[in-house]
Amino acid sequence: MRYIALLRGINISGKNKISMPELKIAFSEKGFADVKTYLNSGNVLFSDDETDIVKLAERIRAIIFETFHLEIPVFVISQDELKGLLSKAPSWWGSDSKDIYDNLIFAIAPYSIETVAEKIGEPSSELEKVEICGNAAFWAFDRKLYAKANWWKKTATPGIGEMITIRTANTLRKIVEM
């Protein structure tokens, strides 16, 4: 089965540095097939016979720790499941508008997106939109006023940031086609 691993918080402001070519090699050496990486933010596509995504995430965390000596949260989703999720996107999400920033927030096991949403609170209605779908939340906000958006302020705070990983609409569209 084809999967996507989304690593949380790597290669940001010089922290948690992971080389994508080295990560690709590590995945391949540990038995994953047809490994590809996309961008420097920790997007890894791979194939494996395992069907338990929790086991896959644990295996990947162990590979990262063994190879890079970093404890990195990992979200795993099948490529088909991600395609299905994107097909359920609300009409306001994923537009080509340069004024709006479209993201998908994934809750990393064992957390649920409902728990994350409860901790963050209501979105700022005039600045951002949120719609929960499965264990993810479609989220869009005004680029110019992002600092005032409630979800923007809280997604990186302690107690919430480690529960999630976020990707843009454009990144996810590219990944599902790889």
Language-model regions: role of each:
Residues M1-S41, L45-M178:
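Surface-exposed, charge/polar-rich loops and edge strands
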